[in-house]
Regions:
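Conserved helicase ATPase core of P-loop NTP-dependent helicases/translocases
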Residues: 147, 163-174, 325, 335-342, ...
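Post-DEXD/H (motif II) to motif III coupling segment of the RecA-like Helicase ATP-binding lobe
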Residues: 200, 208-267, 441
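Walker A/P-loop
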Residues: 107-128
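A conserved SF2-helicase RecA2
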Residues: 246-266, 399, 407-467, 482, ...
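Conserved RecA-like P-loop NTPase helicase motor core
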Residues: 354-444
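Conserved interdomain hinge at the start of the Helicase C-terminal
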Residues: 286-329, 336-339
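Conserved Walker A/P-loop ATP-binding site and its immediately adjacent core
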Residues: 121, 130-155, 329-334
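Conserved helix/coil segment N-terminal to the catalytic DExD/H
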Residues: 167-201, 212-217
Length: 543
């Protein structure tokens, strides 16, 4: 009996061939838990990324191959060939050719990381059809992504037959060349062993989601001979990127960030208001900021929303070529924006939020002002005409969101991209998030200007030297002749530089007026919003 075999359930190794120390290592190493802040009050539950039968352990392919060595055999089916009549009609850009070559050299298993607008979907289709040529399955986590893959497949591979795996629907017969599967369906249903044997390739779109406990089950349910993960953001803040890397393999090709682009402008409005309805930081019993309540508070404060509209409306009138994407964490906030812009005479307004049908999303994509949630804009939004974005609620990581207005090539732009940012000065957390956004803007070479400064001044033109400039002499925060600079002092210097870069406060051109006091109403806050717990389906059905 062979000691180790690559199977559609994972790297299968005999228990009898393992020592007690090796078994202990498997169980310890492959039981993971997310990293959480020290202030996290919930329960962190570890979960396993391996399964076992009475005789074998089934382990993630890449991890086990590294730890135990190559398997004795590969029992994964090669998959059915695609019809010879199908032809990939796209033209690869140089970086896409490099990505495919790296994927091929890695044995058709690994992760490709490309920024927003660099053609991840295009590259994935080329890999499956042009490079491998076997029937393939694409796993997505949102329905609008499935629709985007469908449209791209039809455009690039005319005549391709596309099936779906969603809910009760399971199009995997020989009449389909490719199936697009919803990951929620894959993780919640038990499929008989061999169900997906006709597929030679699996593509996991937005693969970083597979680090989560529930979605990670997809890695154990669909395993093909060729496995490709696509993402723009492979690093998870909870430290669980290793979960999908253990199954798919390492990152084989990555463009971490776009080249610096000083044509992208950042306009920052400093919002100052001492109304306690807005300015009092919500905290828990330990005095820690409750972020969800803080976002609710900021989004619900209508004078702030009105100030933003008053700031932006003249720009849209003066520059009719601007196409604006407004992002918020709260749908009610977007509705307030829609009402206020309509009152200003803007009629071309559309929503881009979860739950909308693709036809309605396509209609919204034609509007001058698009109101969307961060969740929808973080992945898959493809509206090349967008050139302006308003970050209406504070966030730290905005790279994916900003990428939505940078899909056009620099030489093809008719309007320079513009990011509209807002600094909520009342909150320490918001100031910290601004520091991270500013660091991102600086790393991208964007020009930062404040709304209450003269138009011809900016951070870069005010004499600040770039961090990459060798001659930039920085005054240390502390001087210690006996000790080298530490990471701590470097971080403190960055904070001081960020605070120093914020211009001294002058009465802003736009300032909220304190609303008339309203009758006091009893507020009811339920800190525990109950959710339904999903019943886990068995991984496999065996006779």
């Amino acid at each position: 009996m062979q000691r180790a075999i690559q199977t559609t359930r994972g790297y299968a190794i005999l228990k009898s061939a393992l020592s007690a120390a090796q078994i202990s290592h498997i169980q310890k190493e492959l039981t993971v838990a997310p990293n959480v802040p020290l202030s996290y009050a919930g329960t962190v539950t570890p979960f396993k990324v391996w399964v076992e039968s009475s005789t074998r352990y089934y382990l993630p392919h890449a991890w086990a191959s590294t730890y135990f060595g190559p398997a004795d055999a590969d029992a994964r089916p090669p998959g059915d060939s695609l019809p010879s009549t199908l032809e990939f009609k796209g033209t690869l850009r140089p970086h896409q050719e490099e990505a495919l070559a790296a994927f091929r050299d890695a044995g058709h298993s690994g992760i490709i990381c490309l920024p927003c607008g660099y053609g991840k979907t295009f590259t994935g289709i080329a890999a499956a059809t042009q490079l491998i040529g076997r029937r393939f399955i694409i796993v997505v986590h949102k329905e609008f992504l499935a629709d985007q893959w469908t449209a791209e497949l039809r455009a690039l591979v005319p005549g391709i037959r596309i099936g779906r795996i969603q809910g009760e629907r399971c199009d995997i017969g020989p009449q389909f060349d490719v199936a697009i599967a919803m990951i929620q369906t894959i993780c919640s249903r038990a499929y008989p062993i061999g169900t997906f044997d006709s597929f030679g390739t699996v593509i996991f779109d937005e693969v970083h989601h597979l680090g989560a406990e529930h979605f990670s089950q997809a890695l154990q349910r669909i395993q093909c001979r060729n496995m490709l993960g696509l993402t723009a953001t492979p690093n998870r803040v909870d430290g669980l990127s290793k979960v999908f890397e253990w199954s798919l393999g390492r990152i084989v090709y990555q463009i971490a960030r776009r080249p610096k682009d000083d044509s992208v402008g950042v306009r920052v409005m400093r919002y100052v208001c001492d109304d306690p309805v807005y300015a009092n930081t919500p905290t828990n019993w330990r005095g820690e900021t409750v972020r969800a309540r803080l976002i609710n508070q900021i989004a619900a404060f209508k004078p702030r929303t009105s100030a933003l509209v008053e700031w932006i409306a003249p720009m849209l009138r003066d520059e009719p070529g601007r196409r604006l994407l407004i992002l918020s964490d709260r749908r009610e906030h977007l509705m307030d924006f829609a009402t206020l812009f309509a009152a200003q005479g803007f009629a071309s307004i559309g929503y881009y939020v979860g739950g909308m049908k693709q036809a309605d999303l396509d209609m919204s994509a034609t509007k001058q002002i698009i109101l969307g949630t961060y969740a929808m804009a973080s992945e898959g939004m493809n509206i090349p005409t967008l050139n302006t974005i308003l970050l209406a609620t504070p966030k730290s990581n905005i790279e994916q969101s900003v990428g939505r207005i940078l899909r056009q090539k620099k030489e093809e732009r008719l309007v320079a991209p513009r990011i509209l940012d807002i600094l909520d000065t009342a909150f320490m957390e918001a100031n910290g998030q601004w520091a991270k956004r500013r660091k991102f803007y600086k790393s991208c070479g964007y020009t930062i200007k404040w709304s209450d400064e003269p138009e011809n001044t900016s951070e870069s033109s005010a004499g600040e030297m770039d961090e990459d400039t060798p001659t930039a002499a920085k005054t240390p925060l502390f001087v210690d002749d006996d000790a080298p600079p530490t990471a701590c002092s470097k971080e403190l210097n960055e904070i001081v530089e960020t605070l120093a870069s914020i211009p001294p406060y002058e009465p802003p051109t736009i300032k909220s007026t304190k609303p008339k006091p309203k009758p006091k109403a009893k507020r009811i806050y339920n800190p525990k919003d109950p959710t339904l717990s999903a019943t886990k389906a068995p991984l496999f059905i065996e006779d």
